């Protein structure tokens, strides 16, 4: 007889049904040795053997393969310490679940220890995260960056009745009750089936409106295009598309191969739970580790290992799937470009979290870094896709534009020309993929170095982490260039040429932000939620910097004006008429009015800035 480590199938045998209906299973599994009291909550981990089709047990059905538990008390990610509980592992005889078979050998089970999660503990790390969420002035919320819903319905911060009637798992797409953890997120059966059909090829949906339809429990069937977009936004992904996104089952089976008994049946071996296993990390569950490679800080990896990690973090290609009808119009062109940008932003957040060391930064720093460089990264990706296509911009495999095709959009031709020129320079340098991914990571980590000064010791420490990560990525780029076979002098020149192009990309990004803001102001195109928040974050940040610059300039002008006025009062008069004018009450009144007006302007700028 073989045992399975996954949830029991629907067509279970009577013996398996008896296992599920056996009374008092949990008291037998978890004895009093663990010190669990009545207020202890056992939270089923969403990452089990079948990650995309896991359904939490309902009623009396208990699947011993799905009772992997986790807790922030012992999570290395959250910084908690907990005494080892390996001594509490209780080897169980299979007779607890089903009677012994007369002919087959009975497998022995080794149940993983539960990790107690008490609601009464002071969870410092989570409280700090919530403080960031409440106090942050950023338009891009931390919940959007890391997928953590503020109302706790994602399962990371469950209510005390998580195992009973108070189950608070809701579908991340339509907010209906979730039937399980499917394709990387908690979702209902309807959205699970819809996403499954869509990734199998039935995804040529077109929104009849403006691609901003509301998707909820009552309106989820009204627009398939917006529903699919919402699925991607919340982090649903096809398991097995990329190697680093392979299922948890595949990773576990590589480490724990099944043992065959004498009858040829596979006996599932379930040992100690391993905290660093590769599993699909969606934006809805940011606090789980990414694996050994991404868990450690980037400076602990060799340059070759770091380059490989960044290469594997690259997101997949995105398709528009909604061909633009020719001739192009300003509205249709901008709608397609913003649609692609919004999809890329969703994947960009997942990509950033896979950069080694990025998730170890504070939430506010993660948000700020992405806010400062999102368009730079999008434009660098556009150049990389276009480097082998002279004279064309490859926004996606199904959206390739010539220079002249951008004439329908007002003000975009200058940006197109700059994009083509920078892409041509990358083509001349024969940019390699390893160099491209290193430059991309450098843009992310270097984006906020000069945007604000650290105010607190925590800010200084966090800034140090970012700089150390940036140094590691820089070393990785230098190592990549050293493998080209060039001389040391030529390697230095190539490094300088590549880094100098980053300033051109930043200039392009500023032009793009300005143009996108103009299109938004003219109501040419309606922006999607995430793209709109990113744009507003850039706009508000630019306004703050402009206000600070204006205030400094006004103060300087005031000081210079005061010095000039005092100097002019002390200079001897060359003419009698000038002397009379200088001592006249009317002239002194004019000077006083000028100083008063400048002081009033300074005060108004101070108020606006505050």
Swiss-Prot record:
<dbReference type="GO" id="GO:0030520">
    <property type="term" value="P:estrogen receptor signaling pathway"/>
</dbReference>
<dbReference type="GO" id="GO:0005496">
    <property type="term" value="F:steroid binding"/>
</dbReference>
<dbReference type="InterPro" id="IPR001628">
    <property type="entry name" value="Znf_hrmn_rcpt"/>
</dbReference>
<dbReference type="InterPro" id="IPR013088">
    <property type="entry name" value="Znf_NHR/GATA"/>
</dbReference>
<feature type="region of interest" description="Disordered">
    <location>
        <begin position="566"/>
        <end position="596"/>
    </location>
</feature>
<dbReference type="Pfam" id="PF12497">
    <property type="entry name" value="ERbeta_N"/>
</dbReference>
<comment type="subunit">
    <text>Binds DNA as a homodimer. Can form a heterodimer with ER-alpha.</text>
</comment>
<feature type="compositionally biased region" description="Basic and acidic residues">
    <location>
        <begin position="577"/>
        <end position="596"/>
    </location>
</feature>
<comment type="similarity">
    <text>Belongs to the nuclear hormone receptor family. NR3 subfamily.</text>
</comment>
<keyword id="KW-0479">Metal-binding</keyword>
<dbReference type="GO" id="GO:0005634">
    <property type="term" value="C:nucleus"/>
</dbReference>
<keyword id="KW-0238">DNA-binding</keyword>
<feature type="zinc finger region" description="NR C4-type">
    <location>
        <begin position="171"/>
        <end position="191"/>
    </location>
</feature>
<dbReference type="InterPro" id="IPR024178">
    <property type="entry name" value="Est_rcpt/est-rel_rcp"/>
</dbReference>
<dbReference type="GO" id="GO:0071392">
    <property type="term" value="P:cellular response to estradiol stimulus"/>
</dbReference>
<feature type="zinc finger region" description="NR C4-type">
    <location>
        <begin position="207"/>
        <end position="231"/>
    </location>
</feature>
<dbReference type="InterPro" id="IPR001723">
    <property type="entry name" value="Nuclear_hrmn_rcpt"/>
</dbReference>
<keyword id="KW-0675">Receptor</keyword>
<keyword id="KW-0446">Lipid-binding</keyword>
<dbReference type="InterPro" id="IPR035500">
    <property type="entry name" value="NHR-like_dom_sf"/>
</dbReference>
<comment type="function">
    <text>Binds estrogens with an affinity similar to that of ER-alpha, and activates expression of reporter genes containing estrogen response elements (ERE) in an estrogen-dependent manner.</text>
</comment>
<keyword id="KW-0805">Transcription regulation</keyword>
<dbReference type="InterPro" id="IPR000536">
    <property type="entry name" value="Nucl_hrmn_rcpt_lig-bd"/>
</dbReference>
<dbReference type="InterPro" id="IPR028355">
    <property type="entry name" value="ER-beta/gamma"/>
</dbReference>
<keyword id="KW-0539">Nucleus</keyword>
<dbReference type="GO" id="GO:0030284">
    <property type="term" value="F:nuclear estrogen receptor activity"/>
</dbReference>
<feature type="domain" description="NR LBD">
    <location>
        <begin position="302"/>
        <end position="538"/>
    </location>
</feature>
<protein>
    <recommendedName>
        <fullName>Estrogen receptor beta-2</fullName>
    </recommendedName>
</protein>
<keyword id="KW-0804">Transcription</keyword>
<keyword id="KW-0862">Zinc</keyword>
<dbReference type="GO" id="GO:0042562">
    <property type="term" value="F:hormone binding"/>
</dbReference>
<dbReference type="InterPro" id="IPR021064">
    <property type="entry name" value="ER-beta-like_N"/>
</dbReference>
<dbReference type="Pfam" id="PF00105">
    <property type="entry name" value="zf-C4"/>
</dbReference>
<keyword id="KW-0754">Steroid-binding</keyword>
<keyword id="KW-0863">Zinc-finger</keyword>
<dbReference type="InterPro" id="IPR050200">
    <property type="entry name" value="Nuclear_hormone_rcpt_NR3"/>
</dbReference>
<feature type="DNA-binding region" description="Nuclear receptor">
    <location>
        <begin position="171"/>
        <end position="236"/>
    </location>
</feature>
<dbReference type="Pfam" id="PF00104">
    <property type="entry name" value="Hormone_recep"/>
</dbReference>
<dbReference type="GO" id="GO:0043565">
    <property type="term" value="F:sequence-specific DNA binding"/>
</dbReference>
<feature type="region of interest" description="Modulating">
    <location>
        <begin position="1"/>
        <end position="170"/>
    </location>
</feature>
<dbReference type="GO" id="GO:0008270">
    <property type="term" value="F:zinc ion binding"/>
</dbReference>
